């Protein structure tokens, strides 16, 4: 039986369509029309999101865990639990994100993730569409909670071991541009189809620009774990804000970055280069307590995830990030939606698969109200009740 979605509007990733009718068959979008084109089929399962806007499901390029599980567990239970939780918050696709750990442990996690990522998408669950390596090529000074003893110097040989363990599923890698050999590794990763993001870094502007010339395309959680802005040495942060070609992530939870700085970032990057991420860890969707991020313990209380007095990821979800962003900046809905759909898809080179609504695509859509609040979603062809 067909599933039919109706709503006030559809934002398909490029344009707004009034009174849309989206037909879904066998988990894919079969047609897109409007109510003006005729009556709805009588035999269909009709989901009416009156007053809401349909849009592509969200894409989180930086998430470590959720609902008590960490991506580096690399088990069907861990990824399945994460994926179900993410779907209930409007996320249809995500990059399973690692943290710095002993190299052998990272290789084992990547091998396990590779097997899971090769499985077909599960209806009603967000799809892990790739891997984001956050570490081990990070700055000691700006490592955050990532363990110093496992950080490594940039090395094409080490990268190749990681890439091959993941069976080519690595889509994004964070690297500190000031480390010796960083530009060469950025170029090497690019040659293997991996996008690189500058972050966890004390880099100068010149060092950051060298990484960008080598192919770096993104900045990891802007403002966090970065050399502070200085009017004589803009550093990695000033470069991230002013380089027109560079995408820039934001953890928009009101904890990692003040609303005023979110507004500054938005004015600098605009609707073409800004990306919302969660950087969520295993405590997302769970009560306060102690949880794991990779191999170390994190204390969570009142929405803050802390380890050793340092923020250690978040408990944010992308639906909350969207609403926060609109409240902090006053951005219109169709611009705000780009930050969770079109932009992350473009940055990762996955625009041919995700980030837009089109006939033939996997049916993963959200319905949001005018304030950006999630009211429902369909993920991999199956309707999912929005979590509150």
Whereabouts are the PLM-identified features?
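His/Asp/Glu-enriched, well-ordered alpha-helical/loop segment
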Residues: 235-250, 254, 266-278, 283-368
């Amino acid at each position: 039986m067909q599933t039919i979605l109706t709503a006030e509007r559809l934002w398909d990733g490029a344009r707004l369509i009034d009174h849309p009718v989206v037909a879904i068959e066998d988990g894919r979008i079969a047609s897109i029309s409007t109510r003006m084109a005729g009556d709805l089929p009588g035999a269909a399962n009709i989901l009416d999101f009156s007053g809401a806007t349909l849009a592509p499901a969200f894409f989180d390029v930086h998430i470590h865990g959720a609902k008590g599980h960490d991506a580096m567990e690399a088990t069907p239970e861990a990824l399945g639990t994460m994926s179900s939780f993410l779907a209930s918050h409007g996320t249809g696709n995500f990059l399973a994100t690692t943290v710095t750990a002993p190299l052998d442990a990272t290789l084992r996690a990547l091998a396990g993730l590779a097997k899971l990522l090769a499985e077909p998408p599960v209806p009603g669950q967000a799809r892990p569409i790739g891997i984001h390596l956050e570490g081990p090529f990070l700055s000691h000074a700006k490592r955050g909670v990532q363990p110093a003893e496992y950080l490594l110097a940039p090395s094409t040989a080490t990268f190749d071991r990681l890439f091959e363990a993941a069976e080519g599923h690595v889509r994004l890698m964070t690297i500190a541009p000031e480390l010796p050999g960083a530009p060469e590794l950025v170029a090497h990763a690019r040659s293997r189809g991996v996008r690189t993001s500058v972050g966890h870094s004390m880099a100068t502007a010149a060092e950051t620009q060298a990484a960008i010339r080598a192919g770096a395309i993104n900045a990891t959680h802007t403002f966090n774990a970065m050399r502070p802005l200085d009017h004589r040495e803009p550093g990695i942060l000033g470069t991230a804000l002013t380089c027109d070609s560079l995408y820039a992530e934001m953890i928009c939870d009101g904890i990692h970055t003040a609303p005023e700085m979110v507004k500054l970032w938005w004015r600098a990057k605009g609707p073409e280069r800004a990306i919302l991420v969660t950087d969520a860890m295993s405590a997302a969707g769970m009560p306060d307590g102690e949880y794991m991020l990779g191999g170390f313990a994190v204390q969570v209380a009142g929405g803050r995830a802390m380890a050793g007095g340092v923020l250690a990821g978040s408990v944010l979800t992308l639906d909350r990030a969207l609403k926060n962003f609109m409240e902090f900046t006053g951005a219109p809905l169709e611009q705000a939606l780009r930050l969770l759909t079109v932009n992350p898809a473009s940055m990762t080179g996955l625009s041919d698969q995700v980030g837009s609504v089109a006939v033939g695509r996997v049916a993963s859509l959200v319905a949001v109200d005018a304030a950006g609040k999630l009211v429902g979603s369909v993920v991999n062809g199956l309707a999912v009740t929005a979590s509150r």
